[in-house]
Each structure stands twice: as C-alpha cells, then as structure tokens.
From Swiss-Prot:
It catalyses: fluoride(in) = fluoride(out). InterPro entries: FluC. This is Fluoride-specific ion channel FluC. Belongs to the fluoride channel Fluc/FEX (TC 1.A.43) family. HAMAP family: FluC (MF_00454). Pfam families: CRCB. One of its GO terms (biological process) is cellular detoxification of fluoride. Fluoride-specific ion channel. Important for reducing fluoride concentration in the cell, thus reducing its toxicity. One of its GO terms (cellular component) is plasma membrane. Na(+) is not transported, but it plays an essential structural role and its presence is essential for fluoride channel function. The keyword Metal-binding applies. It is found in: Cell inner membrane. The keyword Transferase does not apply. It comes from Nitrosococcus oceani (strain ATCC 19707 / BCRC 17464 / JCM 30415 / NCIMB 11848 / C-107).
Amino acid sequence: MWQKLAWIALAGAGGTLSRYALSGLVQNLCGASFPWGTWVVNGLGCFLFGMIWALAEERLLITGEIRFIVLTGFMGAFTTFSTFAFEASQFLRDSEWLLAAIHLIGQNSLGLVCVFLGFTISQII
C-alpha cells in the first residue's frame, strides 16, 4: 500500500512540474492576453488520458496498476480537466445525454462560481 502511494506521489510531482513548465512555456510564447498555457495543458491532458486509458483497456499494453498510478498521480496533478472530459465522454458514449449535459454544465458552472466566491471572499478577508 505504501509503495503504491509513493508511486502516486512521485507521479503527481512529475505532473505538477510538467504542468508548470509547459503552461509557462506556452504563455511566454503566446503572450499573457489569453490563458493559452491552460488550454494546451488541458487539451494535452485529455489527449493523454484517452490514449493511456485505451492502451491499458483495449490493447493491454499498460497494466491496470500502472494506468492507475499514471492517471491518478501524473494526470491528476497535470490536469483534472482530463478526468472531467473523460467522465463526460463516458456519459456520451453510453448515450446518457441528460447526465452528460448535467455534468458538463454543472461542473463548469460550479467551477466558475467557486472561483468567483474564492476571489470575492479573499478580498473581504
């Protein structure tokens, strides 16, 4: 158990550092007028999440344990948007249109509200 937690933590550190480096690089190249770094990180994270899932699930090229460590540790730290998109794609793949809509609209709305609340509360304190 502890060994698995250590691997997840190590993968998480790698994801965090990768996000910081890639996002910063893209922002420096594209300018700070729009969050292109976040877009690139989230897009790449979604792509990698789907690829890793398929390699483990459909082609059996990655073991379930390695997949768990990479998706939970690295991708969890690199971007949680990849998990969000994957969950939405599963609803769509299963033709659960209402659940997909609730998930997509709800998560985005909740995120915006939470960011606004955090910003507002931090100004009051």
